[in-house]
Every structure is written in structure tokens, then in C-alpha cells.
């Protein structure tokens, strides 16, 4: 992971976004590792949705298309169907989340990752994803709108 972290402060909250990752509009981060994409909830998404009580990625070997459910995450606020930001085959899941789902909140970009997928189409995988700066701007607009409610 890079040492460059972009930060966004809104009201009493501080959100962090590593600049070496890509982000979907739904708040899922992607780390490209060769032909594999590791994914998880962004710091903004995990803080916004509350403490994670349960996290279950699809099984290894499952094929998912971009936008299809790749994991289910239950928080104290809401049950989330996590859409895959890339299409591919699940090659690894974070088994630690079965025992310690709070890792999603404690270390969203490290030990709290959800799944790794073997990418089916590398060129298409990056389409529609945002850089950290682009996602920070989107998160800022969403967070400020929520504070005003």
C-alpha cells in the first residue's frame, strides 16, 4: 500500500483514501495486483454504514459480473449487498472476517478486505472506476449533503 493518503474531514468525521487504489461510486475500493483485483469497503462506506457485525463474500470459484453481488455485509444500521466493481472469478476470500467482521471497520484497506477476483477483462475492469481524488470529491458531496439533513 502507498504512503500517500488523501483525507476528507466533514463535520466530526475524517475519511481516508489511499491514492494507489481505485473506487466505485458505491464505495468499494479496488487494488489491482496483476490479473487479480482485491476489493473492500472504503473508509467512507464503512463509517457511513456503521459497525460491521457480519461479512460473507461469495465462495471461491464463484463467477461474478461487474455490478453483481460479491459479498453481503450486515452492520448495526443496514444490510448491504456489495456490488462487485469488476467482473471475474473469486479466487480468495478473507476468512478472518468470519471470526472478526469488525476488521472491515478497524482496517478497511488492509486486514478488512473482502475478496480477490481474477479479472476477466483487464481493460474493462478499470472503466467506471474513480481515482482517489475523484472519489474523494464524490464522497465530499455526499457527506456534506447528509450533514445538512
Model regions: which residues?
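Short, well-structured beta-strand-loop connectors
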Residues: 59-73, 84, 89-92
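Short, conserved secondary-structure segments in the cores of folded domains
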Residues: 53-54, 60, 78-81, 105
Amino acid at each position: 500500500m502507498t504512503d500517500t493518503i488523501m483525507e476528507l474531514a466533514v463535520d466530526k468525521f475524517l475519511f481516508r483514501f489511499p491514492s494507489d487504489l481505485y473506487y466505485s461510486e458505491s464505495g468499494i475500493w479496488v487494488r489491482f495486483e496483476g490479473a487479480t483485483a482485491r476489493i473492500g469497503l472504503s473508509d467512507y462506506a464503512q463509517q457511513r454504514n456503521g459497525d460491521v457485525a457480519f461479512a460473507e463474500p461469495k465462495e471461491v470459484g464463484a463467477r461474478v459480473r461487474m455490478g453483481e453481488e460479491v459479498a453481503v455485509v450486515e452492520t448495526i444500521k443496514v444490510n448491504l449487498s456489495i456490488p462487485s466493481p469488476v467482473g471475474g472469478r473469486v479466487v480468495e476470500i478473507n476468512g478472518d472476517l468470519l471470526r472478526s467482521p469488525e476488521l472491515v471497520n478497524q482496517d478497511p484497506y488492509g486486514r478488512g478486505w473482502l475478496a480477490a477476483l481474477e479479472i476477466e477483462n483487464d481493460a474493462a475492469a478499470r472503466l467506471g472506476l474513480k481515482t482517489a481524488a475523484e472519489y474523494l470529491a464524490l464522497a465530499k458531496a455526499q457527506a456534506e449533503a447528509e450533514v445538512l439533513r
